[in-house]
Amino acid sequence: MSFVIPSLKLSISSTLTCALVLFTSISGHAQSSSKLDKIVIAGWGKPITEITNLLVEEDKGFFKSKSIEMTIIPGAGGADAIRNLLSGQADVAFTDPASFFTAIDKGEKLRAIYDIYPQNIFNLVSLKSQNITKPSDLKGKRIGVYSLASGTRQNLQILLHQAGLTEADVTIVVTGLLNFLPLMQGQVDATAATDTGLLVGKQKGLGDVNVMEVKNYVNISSDFFVVREETYQQKKDVLKRFLQAYQDSAEWMIRSPQEAAKLAVKFALDGQNESANLEVIKLRNATSVSAMTQQKGLGAFDMGLIQKGVNAYKGFGLIQRDIKVADVISQDLLPGKK
C-alpha cells in the first residue's frame, strides 16, 4: 500500500506487487489475488496513528487478501477529500458527514456506503483561564480550526448554533493539524479539535482545559466512506471487497491494539511513541462501535440519528435543502449483505 503525498513526495511503503495466485472466497465466489483491483482513498489528513489499520497493509495485507490494491491520498480536511473524489483522483473519500451533506446540497451525485466512526469525536478545547464553558461564551473569541475544509470547522458551527451564533460572531484561525500549540501560546482562545487531538495535546504539555464535546449536542457520526454515484452503480463487487477488507482491518485493530500501536511506530508519521500510540488507538477503537454496530456489524449506519444530524445542519444553515438520508446512504455493500 502506498501513501501518496504529492507535496512532500513521501512514500510510506512500496507499491503492492502481484503475488502468487491465491483464491479467497468473496460473496460466494473465488477471487484471484494475482489481479488486483485498484482503489484510491482520498483521506482527510495525513498518515497518522489513528488510521493505523489502513497504514499496515504492507505487513498485514487485509486489502490484498480481497484482491484490492489500496492507496491513500492525504488531504487537509473532509471537504478536501470530497474534492479529490470529485476530481477523479480517488475512488473513495474518507470524509466527515458535514462535508458529504454539503456536497449533496450543492447537487453532487455521491453516496455514503460505510460508517467509519459512528461516534462524534469532535470537541472544543479552551484553557481554564478563558472560562469558556458553554457555546454562548464563544462570542468574540478567536477559535482555531484544522483547516477551513475540515470537520473541526463544521462541528464548531454546530456549537455556535446552540447559542444562536454564527462564524461572524467569532474569529476563525487556521492552525493546521498541530492545533494545540497556538492554544498553548495564546494565539487563540479556544481550538476545535478531536478526541485524539486532545489526547496528543495533553501528552505534549497542554494544561488544565475546559472541553465541550459536540456529541452532547448532536451525536452524528464523524466519518463515512463516500463514493461517486457512478462508482456505486458500476463497481459494487469491488466496493464490497474493499469494505470487507476495511472491516477486517478495523476488527484487527480493536482486537489487537498493542500490535497496532507497535506497528504505528513503523508506519504513522506521529507514531514514534508506542505507549502514546496505544492510547490513541484505544480512543479510535471506541468510536468505531455503537449500539447499531453491536447489532449489525462495523460500518452500519444509524439512519435515524444521522437524519437528526442533517436536520440540524439545515437548522444552522450549513445546508439549504431538505435531504433524506435514505436517498444518499446505502448499506447494501456492507459485509454480510447479499
Regions found by a protein language model. Name each.
Residues M1-K38, K337-K338:
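Short, low-complexity disordered leader/linker segments with a strong preference
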Residues S32-Q185, D189-D195, L206, V211-M212, ...:
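Short, glycine-/small- and polar/acidic-enriched structural segments
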